[in-house]
Regions:
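Short beta-strand/loop element within the Bergerat-fold HATPase_c
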Residues: 86-98
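Short helix-loop "hinge" at the ATP-lid/N-box region of the Bergerat-fold HATPase_c
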Residues: 79-80
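Conserved glycine-rich
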Residues: 152-153
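A conserved beta-strand-to-alpha-helix junction within the catalytic ATP-binding
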Residues: 23-38
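Short helix N-cap motif at coil->helix boundaries in the Bergerat
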Residues: 29, 110-121
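Acidic ATP/Mg2+-coordinating residue in the GHKL
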Residues: 106
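Conserved catalytic submotifs in the C-terminal HATPase_c
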Residues: 23-26, 45, 50-60
Length: 185
Protein backbone atom coordinates (compact mmCIF):
# COMPACT_ATOMS: atom_id res chain seq x y z
CA UNK A 1 0.00 0.00 0.00
CA UNK A 2 2.88 2.36 0.73
CA UNK A 3 4.31 1.85 -2.76
CA UNK A 4 0.90 2.69 -4.26
CA UNK A 5 0.74 5.89 -2.21
CA UNK A 6 4.25 6.92 -3.26
CA UNK A 7 3.50 6.20 -6.94
CA UNK A 8 0.26 8.20 -6.80
CA UNK A 9 2.02 11.16 -5.16
CA UNK A 10 4.63 11.06 -7.94
CA UNK A 11 1.89 10.85 -10.59
CA UNK A 12 0.02 13.79 -9.05
CA UNK A 13 3.21 15.87 -8.88
CA UNK A 14 3.88 15.23 -12.57
CA UNK A 15 0.32 16.22 -13.43
CA UNK A 16 0.82 19.54 -11.65
CA UNK A 17 3.85 20.44 -13.83
CA UNK A 18 3.72 23.68 -15.80
CA UNK A 19 3.37 22.02 -19.23
CA UNK A 20 1.68 18.64 -18.71
CA UNK A 21 0.90 18.04 -22.40
CA UNK A 22 4.34 18.72 -23.81
CA UNK A 23 4.34 15.33 -25.57
CA UNK A 24 0.68 15.37 -26.63
CA UNK A 25 -0.35 13.03 -29.44
CA UNK A 26 -3.58 11.92 -31.07
CA UNK A 27 -5.04 9.35 -28.68
CA UNK A 28 -7.60 6.79 -29.86
CA UNK A 29 -10.09 6.95 -27.00
CA UNK A 30 -11.45 3.44 -27.60
CA UNK A 31 -7.97 1.90 -27.45
CA UNK A 32 -7.12 3.83 -24.27
CA UNK A 33 -10.38 2.84 -22.58
CA UNK A 34 -9.95 -0.80 -23.61
CA UNK A 35 -6.42 -0.83 -22.17
CA UNK A 36 -7.70 0.55 -18.86
CA UNK A 37 -10.45 -2.09 -18.81
CA UNK A 38 -7.88 -4.83 -19.48
CA UNK A 39 -5.81 -3.57 -16.54
CA UNK A 40 -8.85 -3.93 -14.25
CA UNK A 41 -10.09 -7.36 -15.40
CA UNK A 42 -8.22 -9.36 -12.75
CA UNK A 43 -9.59 -7.21 -9.93
CA UNK A 44 -13.10 -7.47 -11.38
CA UNK A 45 -12.73 -11.25 -11.67
CA UNK A 46 -11.77 -11.61 -8.01
CA UNK A 47 -15.04 -9.92 -7.07
CA UNK A 48 -17.17 -11.58 -9.79
CA UNK A 49 -17.94 -8.17 -11.27
CA UNK A 50 -18.74 -7.94 -14.97
CA UNK A 51 -17.35 -4.94 -16.84
CA UNK A 52 -19.85 -4.06 -19.56
CA UNK A 53 -18.45 -1.85 -22.34
CA UNK A 54 -20.70 0.10 -24.68
CA UNK A 55 -19.95 0.56 -28.39
CA UNK A 56 -16.78 2.21 -29.64
CA UNK A 57 -16.96 5.94 -30.32
CA UNK A 58 -14.34 5.99 -33.08
CA UNK A 59 -12.85 9.34 -32.04
CA UNK A 60 -9.59 10.66 -30.72
CA UNK A 61 -8.37 13.50 -28.56
CA UNK A 62 -5.04 15.28 -28.35
CA UNK A 63 -3.38 14.39 -25.11
CA UNK A 64 -1.09 12.26 -23.04
CA UNK A 65 -2.11 8.64 -23.61
CA UNK A 66 -0.51 7.39 -20.38
CA UNK A 67 -2.30 9.99 -18.27
CA UNK A 68 -5.65 9.32 -19.94
CA UNK A 69 -5.32 5.58 -19.35
CA UNK A 70 -4.41 6.32 -15.71
CA UNK A 71 -7.57 8.42 -15.29
CA UNK A 72 -9.80 5.79 -16.94
CA UNK A 73 -8.16 3.07 -14.84
CA UNK A 74 -8.68 5.00 -11.57
CA UNK A 75 -12.39 5.48 -12.31
CA UNK A 76 -12.94 1.84 -13.31
CA UNK A 77 -10.96 0.52 -10.34
CA UNK A 78 -12.97 2.68 -7.93
CA UNK A 79 -16.22 1.43 -9.44
CA UNK A 80 -15.08 -2.17 -8.92
CA UNK A 81 -13.80 -1.56 -5.39
CA UNK A 82 -16.95 0.19 -4.22
CA UNK A 83 -19.44 -2.23 -5.82
CA UNK A 84 -20.83 -5.34 -4.16
CA UNK A 85 -19.58 -8.67 -5.49
CA UNK A 86 -21.48 -10.23 -8.40
CA UNK A 87 -22.63 -6.91 -9.88
CA UNK A 88 -21.79 -4.93 -13.01
CA UNK A 89 -19.73 -1.88 -13.86
CA UNK A 90 -20.80 -0.07 -17.02
CA UNK A 91 -18.37 1.79 -19.27
CA UNK A 92 -19.47 4.14 -22.02
CA UNK A 93 -17.83 6.47 -24.53
CA UNK A 94 -20.00 8.93 -26.45
CA UNK A 95 -19.56 12.04 -28.55
CA UNK A 96 -21.53 15.09 -27.51
CA UNK A 97 -20.99 18.06 -29.83
CA UNK A 98 -17.31 19.01 -29.37
CA UNK A 99 -16.76 16.67 -26.42
CA UNK A 100 -15.99 13.03 -25.81
CA UNK A 101 -17.69 11.70 -22.68
CA UNK A 102 -16.28 8.70 -20.84
CA UNK A 103 -18.69 7.35 -18.20
CA UNK A 104 -18.30 4.72 -15.50
CA UNK A 105 -21.43 3.54 -13.70
CA UNK A 106 -21.42 1.22 -10.71
CA UNK A 107 -24.01 -0.45 -8.52
CA UNK A 108 -22.12 0.43 -5.37
CA UNK A 109 -22.89 2.08 -2.08
CA UNK A 110 -23.21 5.57 -3.52
CA UNK A 111 -21.79 8.78 -2.14
CA UNK A 112 -23.59 10.95 0.43
CA UNK A 113 -24.63 14.31 -1.01
CA UNK A 114 -22.61 16.19 1.61
CA UNK A 115 -19.41 14.55 0.32
CA UNK A 116 -19.93 15.05 -3.43
CA UNK A 117 -18.20 18.44 -3.63
CA UNK A 118 -15.12 17.17 -1.78
CA UNK A 119 -14.41 13.79 -3.36
CA UNK A 120 -11.93 15.22 -5.89
CA UNK A 121 -9.74 16.75 -3.15
CA UNK A 122 -6.38 15.14 -2.39
CA UNK A 123 -6.55 12.55 0.39
CA UNK A 124 -10.29 13.03 0.93
CA UNK A 125 -12.12 9.81 1.70
CA UNK A 126 -15.85 9.48 2.13
CA UNK A 127 -15.46 6.42 4.35
CA UNK A 128 -11.94 5.91 5.74
CA UNK A 129 -12.83 2.43 7.02
CA UNK A 130 -13.95 1.35 3.54
CA UNK A 131 -10.82 2.89 2.01
CA UNK A 132 -8.65 0.75 4.28
CA UNK A 133 -10.58 -2.29 3.06
CA UNK A 134 -10.15 -1.39 -0.63
CA UNK A 135 -6.60 -0.07 -0.30
CA UNK A 136 -7.46 3.43 -1.51
CA UNK A 137 -5.02 6.27 -0.94
CA UNK A 138 -7.41 9.19 -1.39
CA UNK A 139 -5.50 10.41 -4.46
CA UNK A 140 -7.19 8.59 -7.35
CA UNK A 141 -10.02 11.04 -7.98
CA UNK A 142 -7.69 14.02 -7.52
CA UNK A 143 -5.46 12.52 -10.21
CA UNK A 144 -8.50 12.11 -12.49
CA UNK A 145 -9.45 15.77 -11.91
CA UNK A 146 -5.93 16.94 -12.81
CA UNK A 147 -5.81 14.76 -15.94
CA UNK A 148 -9.17 16.16 -17.04
CA UNK A 149 -8.12 19.75 -16.39
CA UNK A 150 -4.76 19.31 -18.11
CA UNK A 151 -6.60 18.08 -21.21
CA UNK A 152 -9.09 20.98 -21.23
CA UNK A 153 -11.86 18.80 -19.84
CA UNK A 154 -13.70 18.17 -16.60
CA UNK A 155 -15.05 15.44 -14.35
CA UNK A 156 -18.45 15.22 -12.69
CA UNK A 157 -20.32 12.72 -10.58
CA UNK A 158 -23.93 11.72 -10.04
CA UNK A 159 -24.59 9.51 -7.05
CA UNK A 160 -27.41 8.28 -4.90
CA UNK A 161 -26.72 6.49 -1.64
CA UNK A 162 -27.52 2.81 -1.91
CA UNK A 163 -27.89 2.95 -5.70
CA UNK A 164 -24.42 3.63 -7.04
CA UNK A 165 -22.56 6.36 -8.86
CA UNK A 166 -21.81 7.57 -12.37
CA UNK A 167 -18.60 9.45 -13.06
CA UNK A 168 -18.35 11.37 -16.34
CA UNK A 169 -15.01 12.53 -17.73
CA UNK A 170 -15.41 15.05 -20.57
CA UNK A 171 -12.58 15.83 -22.99
CA UNK A 172 -12.42 18.13 -26.01
CA UNK A 173 -12.94 16.08 -29.14
CA UNK A 174 -10.37 16.32 -31.90
CA UNK A 175 -12.17 17.88 -34.87
CA UNK A 176 -12.78 15.44 -37.73
CA UNK A 177 -11.16 12.81 -35.60
CA UNK A 178 -12.23 9.51 -37.03
CA UNK A 179 -9.46 7.12 -36.12
CA UNK A 180 -9.11 5.98 -39.72
CA UNK A 181 -8.09 9.47 -40.85
CA UNK A 182 -5.89 10.53 -37.92
CA UNK A 183 -4.45 7.26 -36.73
CA UNK A 184 -2.53 7.01 -33.50
CA UNK A 185 1.03 7.96 -32.85
Amino acid sequence: RLSTLVQEIIDLSRLQDADPLLDAIHVDIDEAVNEAIDQCQVLAGTRDIDIIRGPNAGVSVVGDRTHLIMAFHNLIENAINYSPASTRVGIGVECREDLVEFTVTDQGVGIPEKDLERIFERFYRVDPARSRETGGTGLGLSIVKHVAGNHGGDISVWSLEGQGSTFTLRLPRLKDSSIASTGTE
